[in-house]
Design a protein with these regions (language model features):
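Residues at the start of alpha-helices and the adjacent loop-to-helix junctions
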Residues: 8, 22, 33-35, 51, ...
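Aspartate-rich (DDxxD/NDxxD/DxxxD) Mg2+/diphosphate-binding motifs
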Residues: 59-78, 108
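Acidic (Asp/Glu-rich) catalytic motifs at the cytosolic membrane interface
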Residues: 19, 32-65, 103, 164-178
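Topogenic membrane-insertion module of multi-pass membrane proteins
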Residues: 1-26, 31
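Alpha-helical transmembrane segments and adjacent TM-loop junctions that form the membrane-embedded core
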Residues: 9, 78-257
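Alpha-helical transmembrane segments of integral membrane proteins, especially early/N-terminal helices
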Residues: 5-15, 44-57, 81-94
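Histidine-centered active-site/metal-ligand motif
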Residues: 45, 71, 248-251
Length: 257
């Protein structure tokens, strides 16, 4: 069962890594040709995402280590540690760095976006690839969401850190590319690079917001959270027996994914 979960979670990670490598290469080519602030931010975003997926694969390998005297419950929580590192990288290297780069161009909008239609083509290519990766993540969420929870509740209660990260990254990638497309079009038709720089700032803020959400979730999992609401109800229902007059209190902790 655990092996099946690991394979499922890692499938979305590998799909996202492949997508981000392709998209990162195309975005850097687009930035080199156009000088677009939004394209630079998107390029940084994709490189950070590639590093994040590699960290998740490392964490998954460490989490699969066998039980030992030193770690009698295994090392599965290593996933949460690496996931927290990923959230920090997404905030600082992806979001904060991108905001700083774009803000510089926002207040000094002397740059011009060149080869606009080539940039648009690269952004559309990236949008298609990232959408495919996002569909893989959504498919895995549906497979794991056996209780039929809403998407928001599933994300809040899920103990599958790799799924949370990939869904957040792919969602930000799709939204970020749409923002970059909008900024590039506005800059082209108004001949004003302000909109390109503004879209870069918005993309950076989007990444910072996603990183903070992920960091909050993984911090809780790393220090220890109770089981999900539905699992707790199942545990309590097991005590609904005639020989038990009253259930006073139940304390639980989720040890690992």
């Amino acid at each position: 069962m655990n092996e099946e979960k690991n394979k499922g979670g890692m499938m979305s990670v590998i799909a996202a890594l492949g997508a981000n490598v392709l998209v990162a290469i195309s975005k850097f080519i687009g930035f080199a040709i156009s000088g677009s602030a939004a394209m630079l931010n998107e390029s940084i975003h994709s490189i950070v995402d590639c590093g994040n997926e590699i960290l998740l694969l490392v964490g998954n390998k460490q989490a699969a280590a066998k039980v030992s005297d030193k770690h009698p419950f295994g090392q599965a929580r290593a996933k949460y540690f690496y996931s927290l590192v990923v959230a920090m990288m997404l905030f600082f290297a992806g979001g904060a760095l991108g905001v700083m780069e774009a803000t510089e161009k926002l207040f000094h909008p002397e740059h011009n976006v060149e080869n606009t239609w080539l940039v648009m083509g690269i952004l559309v290519f990236g949008l298609i690839v990232e959408t495919v990766s996002l569909r893989v993540a959504i498919k895995e969420i549906k497979a794991l969401n056996k209780d039929g929870l809403s998407l928001y509740r599933f994300l809040r209660e899920s103990r599958h850190s790799e799924i949370l990260i990939i869904f957040a990254e792919d969602s930000c990638a799709v939204l970020g590319l749409l923002i970059a497309l909008g900024g590039t079009l506005l800059s082209h038709f108004t001949n004003n690079p302000f909109y390109d720089a503004l879209s870069g700032v918005l993309i950076g803020l989007l990444l910072c917001g996603a990183a903070l959400f992920l960091a909050r979730e993984f911090y809780g999992l790393l220090i220890g959270e109770s089981v999900t609401t539905n699992d707790l109800l199942r545990i309590k229902s097991a005590f609904n027996r005639t020989e038990i007059s009253k259930l006073i209190n139940v304390k639980t902790i989720h040890l690992s994914p």
